[in-house]
Amino acid sequence: MTLGQQAESLAQGYLEQQGLTFVARNVRYPFGEIDLVMRHKHHWVFVEVKYRSANQFGGAIQALSKAQIGRIRMAASHYLQTHKLDVPCRFDVVAIEDAQIHWLVDAF
């Protein structure tokens, strides 16, 4: 299992402990990928997982570029259309740095 896969597993477990329900993982489209799809009450939650072993380059949260955000939004829109879902959604980020988990709800 790669470091990225380990981080996604850790993030998934953490979010499940916080009351979210797992739906899908590593949803890939030619134009973007969604790390985790979760549900929280009536919301569908699209989660980007960022892992950094050290904070020397700005940390995991700063590693998310505007271009990445655009690709995630496009992938989420396609996911909702493909599954014929007309539901509220949000975009969260789980940042894992030095074994600490930071969950940013409605991050973008």
UniProtKB/Swiss-Prot annotation:
Name of this chain's protein: UPF0102 protein Shewana3_3881
Pfam families hit by this protein: UPF0102
InterPro entries assigned to the protein according to its UniProt record, in alphabetical order: Restrct_endonuc-II-like, tRNA_endonuc-like_dom_sf, UPF0102_YraN-like
Disulfide bonds: none
GO molecular function, one term: nucleic acid binding
Record SUPFAM superfamilies: Restriction endonuclease-like
Domain of life, source organism: Bacteria
Species annotation: Shewanella sp. (strain ANA-3)
Database matches in Gene3D superfamilies: 3.40.1350.10
Family, as annotated: Belongs to the UPF0102 family.
HAMAP family membership: UPF0102 (MF_00048)
Ranges annotated as spanning the membrane: none
